[in-house]
C-alpha cells in the first residue's frame, strides 16, 4: 500500500479548507462593501436634507450652526467613502495595483477631522450652557458658533495640507520621520477630541441625573448624547487606521482585513446624525408623531423642554405658511 496516500489526502483536505475560508472571506468583504455603499447613499441623502433645511428654510441658532457644519463635513466624508467602497468592491473581482486617489484621501482626512471637531464643540458648548446659563444666554458673543466652526475648518485644513505637502509633495520616502511625526500629531489631536467629547458628555449625564440642580432633559441634549455615542463607538477606528497606515508606509490596503469593518463603521458614523435627528424629532410625549421634515428637525435641535413644544411648532408652522404665501405670490 502506498504510504503517501494519507499525506495526499491531508493535503487535499487542507487545500479545500483554505479555499473555503478564502471564498467565505471574499463573500463577507463583498457584502460589507455593498452595505457600505448603501449606508453612504442613505447618509448623503440625509445630510443633504439637513443642509438644505438649516441653510435655507430655518432660522439658525448657536447649535444649528454647529449641526450645519457637521452635516457638511459628513457629506464630504461620505462622498469619498463611496469612492473607497467602490474601489474595494472592484478589487473583489479584479485586482488593481493603484493607490487610493490622492484627492479623495485628503478630503477624507479634512472631513473626518472637521466632523469630530464639530461634534466635540457642540458637546462642550452645551455643557457650558448648562454650567453657566446666565453668562451663556446674556454675555456670550453672538457669532461665537460661526467663529469656532471657521477656526475648526481652518485647523483641519492646515493639518490636511501639511500631511499632503510633507508626505506626498516632498516625497514620503525621504521624509518618513516628518510624515510619521505629523501622523502622531493628528492622532494626538484626535485623542484630545475624544477625551473632551467623552468627559463633557459624562459631565452632562452627571448634571442631569445626579446634580444638586438637575438640568431638564431637552431634545437637543438627547440628540447630542446619541450623536456623541455613535462617534465614540464608530468614529475612532478610522483615526487608528490612519495612524497604522502611515506606520506601514502607505500600504494599498490599510489595516489589512479590518479595512472593510472600519469603512463600514465610519459610514455609519457619518450618516447617524440625520437619522438621530429624525428619531428624536419624531418623538413627542413618548410617542411617535409625524410632521414635516422641517418641524422634525426643529424639534430635534430644540433647547427648551418638551412642554414648550407647542410654541415651537406654532412658530415653525407660521414661518412655513409665510413661505408658502411668498412662493404662491411669485
UniProtKB/Swiss-Prot annotation:
GO molecular function, a single term: G protein-coupled receptor activity
Topology Extracellular: residue spans: 1-33, 84-101, 168-177, 241-260
Gene3D superfamilies: Rhodopsin 7-helix transmembrane proteins
Main location: membrane
Residues that carry a glycan: 16
Cysteines joined through disulfide linkages: none
Keywords from the UniProt entry: G-protein coupled receptor, Glycoprotein, Membrane, Receptor, Transducer, Transmembrane, Transmembrane helix
Cellular component terms per the entry's GO annotation: membrane
Chain segments carrying region Disordered: 302-330
Regions of this protein lying in the Cytoplasmic compartment: 55-62, 123-146, 199-219, 282-330
Bilayer-spanning residue ranges: 34-54, 63-83, 102-122, 147-167, 178-198, 220-240, 261-281
InterPro entries: GPCR_Rhodpsn, GPCR_Rhodpsn_7TM, MRGPCRFAMILY
Topology with respect to the bilayer: Multi-pass membrane protein
Compartments reported by the entry: Membrane
Compositionally biased residues, Acidic residues: 304-330
Function: Orphan receptor. Probably involved in the function of nociceptive neurons. May regulate nociceptor function and/or development, including the sensation or modulation of pain.
Family named by the database record: Belongs to the G-protein coupled receptor 1 family. Mas subfamily.
Protein name: Mas-related G-protein coupled receptor member B8
Organism encoding this protein: Mus musculus (Mouse)
Gene encoding the protein: Mrgprb8
Amino acid at each position: 500500500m502506498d504510504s503517501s496516500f494519507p499525506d495526499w489526502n491531508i493535503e487535499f483536505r487542507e487545500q479545500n479548507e483554505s479555499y473555503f475560508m478564502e471564498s467565505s472571506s471574499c463573500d463577507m468583504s463583498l457584502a460589507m462593501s455593498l452595505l457600505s455603499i448603501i449606508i453612504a447613499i442613505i447618509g448623503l441623502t440625509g445630510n443633504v436634507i439637513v443642509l438644505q433645511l438649516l441653510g435655507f428654510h430655518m432660522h439658525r441658532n448657536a447649535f444649528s450652526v454647529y449641526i450645519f457644519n457637521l452635516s457638511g463635513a459628513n457629506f464630504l466624508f461620505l462622498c469619498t467613502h463611496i469612492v473607497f467602497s467602490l474601489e474595494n468592491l472592484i478589487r473583489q473581482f479584479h485586482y488593481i495595483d493603484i493607490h487610493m486617489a490622492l484627492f479623495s484621501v485628503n478630503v477624507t482626512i479634512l472631513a473626518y477631522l472637521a466632523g469630530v471637531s464639530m461634534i466635540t464643540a457642540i458637546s462642550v458648548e452645551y455643557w457650558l450652557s448648562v454650567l453657566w446659563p446666565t453668562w451663556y444666554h446674556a454675555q456670550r458673543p453672538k457669532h461665537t458658533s460661526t467663529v469656532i466652526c471657521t477656526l475648526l475648518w481652518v485647523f483641519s485644513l492646515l493639518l490636511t495640507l501639511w500631511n499632503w505637502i510633507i508626505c506626498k509633495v516632498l516625497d514620503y520616502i525621504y521624509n518618513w520621520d516628518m510624515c510619521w511625526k505629523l501622523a502622531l500629531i493628528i492622532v494626538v489631536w484626535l485623542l484630545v477630541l475624544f477625551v473632551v467629547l467623552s468627559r463633557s458628555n459624562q459631565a452632562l449625564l452627571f448634571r442631569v441625573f445626579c446634580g444638586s440642580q438637575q438640568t431638564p432633559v431637552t431634545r437637543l441634549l438627547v440628540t447630542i448624547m446619541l450623536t456623541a455615542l455613535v462617534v465614540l463607538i464608530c468614529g475612532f477606528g478610522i483615526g487608528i487606521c490612519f495612524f497604522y497606515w502611515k506606520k506601514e508606509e502607505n500600504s494599498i490596503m490599510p489595516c489589512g482585513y479590518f479595512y472593510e469593518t472600519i469603512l463600514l463603521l465610519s459610514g455609519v458614523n457619518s450618516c447617524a446624525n440625520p437619522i438621530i435627528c429624525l428619531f428624536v424629532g419624531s418623538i413627542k410625549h413618548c410617542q411617535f408623531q409625524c410632521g414635516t421634515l422641517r418641524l422634525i428637525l426643529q424639534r430635534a435641535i430644540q433647547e427648551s423642554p418638551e412642554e414648550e413644544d407647542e410654541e415651537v411648532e406654532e412658530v415653525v408652522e407660521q414661518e412655513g405658511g409665510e413661505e408658502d404665501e411668498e412662493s404662491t405670490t411669485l
